[in-house]
A protein has these predicted regions:
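A nucleotide- and high-energy phosphate-metabolite-utilizing enzyme signature
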Residues: 1-168
C-alpha cells in the first residue's frame, strides 16, 4: 500500500546515500535493496493495515548488528541518521502537505534509546524489561520496509515474548 511504498522508497534512498558516502562499512550498491540490514517495523494501525486518512504511522527502526560486528559504532550512527531523515522526509510539511505523521516512540524505552537500535539490543530489552503494553503492541507488528528476512527473523525470535504461555 501507499504507506509501505513511501517508507520503503525513503528508506532505500537514504541508505543508498549512506552507502555512497562510505558510512556503512563493507556495504555496496548491491546491499541497498535490503537497506543494508536496516528494518522498519510497522506497529498499530500501520502494522494491521488499518490506516485511515488521518492516521499517523508508528514505526520501530532496527538494524542487523551481526552485519556490522567490526564497525558497529559507525553503522549505528549511519542508521540513526537514516531514521531521523526518513521521519523528517515523511512528516515535515511542504506546500503540498506531508506524507505521514511519523511516530518513533514505540521503540524500547524511547526516552533513553536512539531512534534506531540494534536488533540484539531490542531483543534483550523485551526479554528482560518488556512490559505488557509492549507485548500487546507487538501483536500487530510486521516488517514494513528494509531487510525482510532479518526483520521477520527478529519478529520470530520475539514470538515467545509476545505469545507467552502464562500471563502473571
Amino acid at each position: 500500500d501507499f504507506a509501505d511504498a513511501a517508507v520503503g522508497r525513503s528508506l532505500t534512498s537514504l541508505v543508498a546515500a549512506e552507502v555512497k558516502r562510505g558510512k556503512l562499512p563493507g556495504q555496496g550498491p548491491n546491499d541497498v535493496a535490503d537497506a543494508a540490514g536496516m528494518v522498519v517495523l510497522a506497529m498499530g494501525k500501520a502494522g494491521a493495515g488499518e490506516l485511515n486518512y488521518s492516521s499517523d504511522i508508528d514505526l520501530i527502526c532496527l538494524f542487523d548488528d551481526e552485519r556490522y560486528a567490526d564497525d558497529y559504532a559507525e553503522a549505528r550512527a549511519a542508521f540513526i541518521r537514516v531514521t531521523r531523515r526518513m521521519a523528517a522526509l515523511l512528516s515535515e510539511p511542504t506546500g503540498d502537505g506531508y506524507v505521514f505523521r511519523t511516530d518513533l516512540r514505540l521503540r524500547p524505552d524511547p526516552s533513553v534509546t536512539p531512534v534506531c537500535l540494534s536488533m540484539d539490543a531490542a531483543e534483550r530489552y523485551y526479554e528482560s524489561l518488556g512490559r505488557p503494553w509492549e507485548r500487546a503492541a507487538l501483536i500487530k507488528a510486521r516488517v514494513m520496509a528494509g531487510d525482510q528476512k532479518a526483520g521477520q527473523g527478529f519478529l520470530d525470535r520475539l514470538s515467545p515474548f509476545v505469545w507467552r504461555k502464562h500471563l502473571d
